[in-house]
Amino acid sequence: IKDILGILLLVLFLMLLVLFAPDLLGDPDNYTPANPLNTPPHIKPEWYFLFAYAILRSIPNKLGGVLALVSSILILILMPLLHTSKQRSMMFRPFSQCLFWILVADLLTLTWIGGQPVEYPFIIIGQLASVLYFFIILVLMPITSTIENNLLKW
């Protein structure tokens, strides 16, 4: 009974929010008149694609940016194939642990840059973070796995 009461109160609250104050949680920039010739600066993808959007914007060439965007997402799908370490866990692999946290920091930086306007300091930071993203995944992770395989005598 108390679960049904909680669900009904939640539904009531959401209905009141939607029916009486639909703009309460919206973005006020959505009400500015649009220029059909360019994309407004407040338009950006959802938060989980902001890292890929930052990589897209970091390359001035349109085709190169799109290829980098697609490859940044495909790399995440192909990461299990790039994992060459004999030991699956990172518990006894301190180099891989450090590299993982550097990659997490780089992804957070790219996500932050993807939400920023295209201005001077953000462009350079986005380009450096994009290069670091691909360098960590394609170069440093396989090298680190090989070194740790040799250290662990696998």
From Swiss-Prot:
The gene is MT-CYB. It is a multi-pass membrane protein. The chain crosses the membrane at residues 1-21, 63-83, 95-115, 122-142. This is Cytochrome b. The cytochrome bc1 complex contains 11 subunits: 3 respiratory subunits (MT-CYB, CYC1 and UQCRFS1), 2 core proteins (UQCRC1 and UQCRC2) and 6 low-molecular weight proteins (UQCRH/QCR6, UQCRB/QCR7, UQCRQ/QCR8, UQCR10/QCR9, UQCR11/QCR10 and a cleavage product of UQCRFS1). This cytochrome bc1 complex then forms a dimer. GO terms for molecular function: metal ion binding; ubiquinol-cytochrome-c reductase activity. SUPFAM superfamilies: a domain/subunit of cytochrome bc1 complex (Ubiquinol-cytochrome c reductase). InterPro entries: Cyt_b/b6_C, Cyt_b/b6_C_sf, Cytb/b6-like_sf, Cytochrome_b_C_euk/bac. Belongs to the cytochrome b family. CDD domains: cytochrome_b_C. Heme 1 (or BL or b562) is low-potential and absorbs at about 562 nm, and heme 2 (or BH or b566) is high-potential and absorbs at about 566 nm. Keywords: Electron transport, Heme, Iron, Membrane, Metal-binding, Mitochondrion, Mitochondrion inner membrane, Respiratory chain, Transmembrane, Transmembrane helix, Transport, Ubiquinone. Pfam families: Cytochrom_B_C. Its cofactor is heme. GO terms for biological process: mitochondrial electron transport, ubiquinol to cytochrome c. Its main location: mitochondrion. GO terms for cellular component: mitochondrial inner membrane. Component of the ubiquinol-cytochrome c reductase complex (complex III or cytochrome b-c1 complex) that is part of the mitochondrial respiratory chain. The b-c1 complex mediates electron transfer from ubiquinol to cytochrome c. Contributes to the generation of a proton gradient across the mitochondrial membrane that is then used for ATP synthesis. It is found in: Mitochondrion inner membrane. Binds 2 heme groups non-covalently.
